């Protein structure tokens, strides 16, 4: 019986995503973000049905096991744009390095100005890095990885919902620039949003996601020390 329940929860997740996708396609607005809608739909079902979250997560084992493959799938549009990206590697690398540095510095300084402890500054610092790397960076700096995970999700949601809209309003028209910008600050969630909007933006967001994770993990200790250098 338990085996059947596992598959039922898996199908429930797929149904929630399908329903969110239909709503997103129907209104065609970045506000109706597929990820956010899926979370809201599933949360409502769990609350109304009084389904324990632990049971739901255990029942999603088949989908959870596919998370690694979904990350690998992000490499497909990157491969399709590989030649163009190779010609612009200097611009891409410099943009990603600057974006990584400023994303960590701004978050850390804001936390410091708000009176946060060094532990909380270390927790907030890697908010714009993809989840696994961000949690490890936070732990290494003396932060709280679990709280960092929340910050990563919030940063991802903000970028995936508003990133594309804000850049368009600012007059940024090049999909390459949009992809690099969104991927640098909103990691996987922002990249998925770019994928849904424009393949080129999705490709550049993918490479920004990967490079920012690597570069930020190297720069994080130096940025953390820099924040407290003048304090």
Swiss-Prot record:
GO terms for cellular component: plasma membrane. The chain crosses the membrane at residues 4-24, 29-49, 58-78, 95-115, 147-167, 211-231. Keywords: Cell membrane, Membrane, Transmembrane, Transmembrane helix. It is found in: Cell membrane. It is a multi-pass membrane protein. Belongs to the YohK (E.coli)/YwbG (IPA-22R) (B.subtilis) family. This is Uncharacterized protein HI_1298. It comes from Haemophilus influenzae (strain ATCC 51907 / DSM 11121 / KW20 / Rd).
